[in-house]
Amino acid sequence: MCIRDRSLAFTGLGWRLLASGRRFLYAHLWMACLFALQTGALCVKAYQTGMCPIRGASEVLFFLSWTINLFYLLLGRAYRMSVLGIFTAPAIAVLTALSLLIGLYGADVQGTHDFWVTAHVGVAMMSYGAGGLAAAAGVAFCMQNECLKRRQIPGTCRLLPPIRTLEASMKRLVLVAFLLLLAGEWLGWQRHLPINGAKTSIVILLTLGYSILLWFIYRRGMPGRALAYCCVALFIASMSIFLVS
């Protein structure tokens, strides 16, 4: 729990560095330090329980925040999207805070040591993390697009990546999220794991949603603004799976 508290503090400081618009390299390094703390917390929990720490809502939310930060660090600098930390850091902070609250006041959940269950849930969480970063890119796209339409470029929009960079990043992240979601489904269905019916329905709908979106992207073409809305909508829809018990 102490490491999670420090992770939350690091997230806030990282957001301040990103929002200041100065020295994005320092902010990126700060987010990397946050990632190290998150990884440490997950390793400690895994050592204590003997399994991947994705047993209850508290651990799942913290693991999700870790995956979002992972994709941010992997793709942020590579695709000139480091500034998306302005959106990513608050999302990580909210997920970490919710994880802490649920961990403090919720009952401890006993998990299973089945490797396939752990792999299934872990890969699915990584899919949601990629979808979360795609949603962040979508929000940034809408902001940048609105600034260009008004021909007014405030300080925040000056820091955002170009429209084409954001659009290309959304396409890549949607594809990554879709492939990871398929991999998670395969791990679950290959071993005939007992999965909640409502959650299965949500995952099937998400798969259809990503499939249709990718078909439009690569076969018919899709305006960037519509793509941004779809990325945000799909991420919100994926979060509904945590509301189902």
Model region roles, listed by residue range:
Residues 1-5:
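Conserved small/polar residues in nucleotide/adenosyl-binding loops
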Residues 38-88, 186-204:
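Membrane-interface helix-loop-helix modules in multi-pass inner-membrane proteins
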Residues 240-245:
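Juxtamembrane boundary at the C-terminal end of a transmembrane helix
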Residues 56, 67, 112-129, 161-169:
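Short aromatic-rich membrane-water interface segments that cap or initiate transmembrane helices
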Residues 147-190:
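A mid-sequence, solvent-exposed acidic-amphipathic segment
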Residues 216-236:
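Interfacial loop-to-transmembrane junctions
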Residues 78-120:
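Hydrophobic alpha-helical segments and helix pairs
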Residues 25-31, 56-59, 82-93, 225-232:
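Cytoplasmic-side transmembrane-helix entry/capping segments in multi-pass membrane proteins
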